[in-house]
Amino acid sequence: MDIPNRVFAHRGLNTLAPENTMAAFRKVVEHGLNWIETDVDILGDGTVIICHDTTLDRTTNKSGGYYGLTAADLETIDAGSWFGSEFAGEKLPTLHQLVDFMNETGLNANIEIKSNEAGAAMTRQLIKAVIKELGRLDGPEVLVSCFNHVLLSEFHALAPDIPLGCLYETCSLHDDWRSVLELVGASYIHPEDAGLTREKVRAFRDAGFGVNVWTVNSPARANELFNWGATGIFTDVAHLIPCC
């Protein structure tokens, strides 16, 4: 599997602008970078939004969950002031807005689908809505990942041409990883950096999978991982890490 090394800006350039906002994604383009990693979930009206958490408390001026909200509610949510006054009024983006931005700029994206907590029906609605939005891409590359491998398997059944990455925490990366990836239909494994060894990276690569590691903020560690055969790293400081 011949894959160019990739540096994914984790939630955009989140040290320079509020995470998972258009401001953070614009910073990526301004720095000449090619890939972002971002997170998607769904509102009550079916709108797919960019947000890491299942509540609004940490990164906005609101609190509580958003599964009962609609697109109209997004106008009242400030996702920037917590980071800095210059970002006051920054909104939670929608996936629709991000796809438009990708088409305009050529930016590529790893879309992490959050493991929706509202049940199977809403999860399937999220999967279908993401597939519909990604179908509007005209040129940029996309990779879809998730910690919920059952969700990824359902996604693959509906969109077999979109490459998938199985996310793993170190504590959940068991010896059956190859069976899981093959059953899901994944092309990539996304392991946590903590405890990752050269031997494990080589095993992943020898089995035919790309290896994108999270979250790596040390340029020296990134270089080591690439030398081991990793195909990508997710980082909060993508502007400080060379791609190869």
Describe each model-derived feature in a short phrase.
Residues 1-244:
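Phosphate-group recognition and catalysis centered on beta-loop-alpha active-site segments
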